[in-house]
Amino acid sequence: MSAAECPALKPRPGAHKMPAMETDTIIIGNGPSAMILSFILHGHLPYYSMNRPHPDPLLHAKLKDNPELLDADVTGLTEHFHASRLSYSTQALPVNVLLDTLVRPSVDVDVGEGETRVEWRYVPEKAVPHLVFGNAPKAGGQWNDNLVFASWDIQTLSYASMLCLPGYSFAEHYRKVNGKDLPAFTRPTRREIMDYFSAYPEAVGIDDSFQNNETLSGITRTANGFFISSHNIHCRHLVLASGIFSHVLQPLPMLQPLRFLQPTPEIPLLVIGSGFSAADIIISAPENQKVLHIFKWDPEGHPSPLRSCHQRAYPEYAGVYRLMKRAALAAAPATHKRPGKPKRTTSSPFLESRAWDEVYEGLPNAQVIAVEIQSESAVVTFQLPDGNTIERTVRGLVYATGRRGSLGYLDKPLLSEVLGCPEGTEPSPIISGKTLRAKALEDLEVAKDVFIIGSLTGDSLIRFAYGSCVQTAGRLIRAHTGDDKSGCRTPSSSRPQSSYLRVMNGMEGHEIYHNSDDCHQLEKIDSEAKETPPTSLDGLWSWMMRFWKS
């Protein structure tokens, strides 16, 4: 991506006139993982707490005589996890699973506020000078974004205890803001979590390191570290925490004009997507708004992530999945429908909240083959799986098929080094959760003095961010204090590099995008992912704002 395509990549005006700065570490991104790492680098070190033994007696036995977690032997501590009676994730990096079970023991079977087995000791002499840069206006990173215009009052998939950062929990923030205790089993709204994250740096005293609403660019390797040309800063270490959710996948050119049409209840809003982002739009829409939903349906090969949502825990997402399933069954050829006893059907408050048969139409696996703009609406022609074509009149489009991240702030040689591109190949800055996964399995230091944390490791849930942050902090602290052992590289995984761990995409389950042709999509996005002018979606934005304020 060039500076002409994306103004954010242009050097900061007057950067050459700024006084040169030096610091040990630059963290790129101001989201949850950056905040966890900054908290540690300010001198708050994690130790295993023996006030109450961990539910896993073997893990407790391994840690009781060596409680310091910065230098934890991940391989030795996690090698028994696969045979444990406790529930340990087999998908996340072992270091992330280790810290998750210590911070939130047995959280998968008890989502209450269980007692943490991690105590944070303040050791100021271990602090590492660092700065945190993020282009989000407030701390929280992409949690400040609403790129598909869903309601801010949509609940997160994770419970509050799974979204907490060290030193200041969401429960403490809730009590401070509302003057009462947080109810058990709370799924906060996205607005509440955004407010919590923005308040976090000041609450724990790390706001002195945060430079929000700043975009870095032109980062190059030097003889002694790195130079950030956009801000005239030198540093010894880089930590990439920019995530994999900054760029929304763009619709085909023929669909682009639909985004400028303002929806009206009488004419369907076209929603394209099979996951949580598409569901958020359907849930957020006014009750009388008609919706035409285009989605992939392959329950045996690549099922929608909505399928895993239990009706009691996530009634709204389970309800949208039920609508999709009904549409898929209705569209299936008669020869594919299995005869049998009718199943007992259940309903839910969400499914009874509006006349779905009147406002929702789902077209599974339909393809757009033509678009004709007609004044304030458009006629879209779809090809169905059986080869037949149909036409529908629509107003407005939400294209919610996923997001990607970008490492465009690195210059090409450094980008190639980070990605491990063969010599002579052109590196693409657009990345997914799979891009650096193989490197993360081997080491979080993906290039000399360059580390990745958070969703760049392939584990995007906040609960799994602690591990990469603790391990990276240990390396940075040892290097700064002179205790670093030359050539010592701590693996983030106890498994062979050839082991396959499924990437856990999704910002707390949102914006999940499943595509088997990942490399092709990355190439396509690289040429299409541009900054969208704030006024380009006025129609849809004003429609959503009018609804939320009503």
Per-range role (PLM):
Residues 142-183:
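Flavin (FAD/FMN) cofactor-binding and adjacent substrate-gating region
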Residues 2-136, 142, 183-550:
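Flavin (primarily FAD) cofactor-binding/catalytic cores of flavoenzymes
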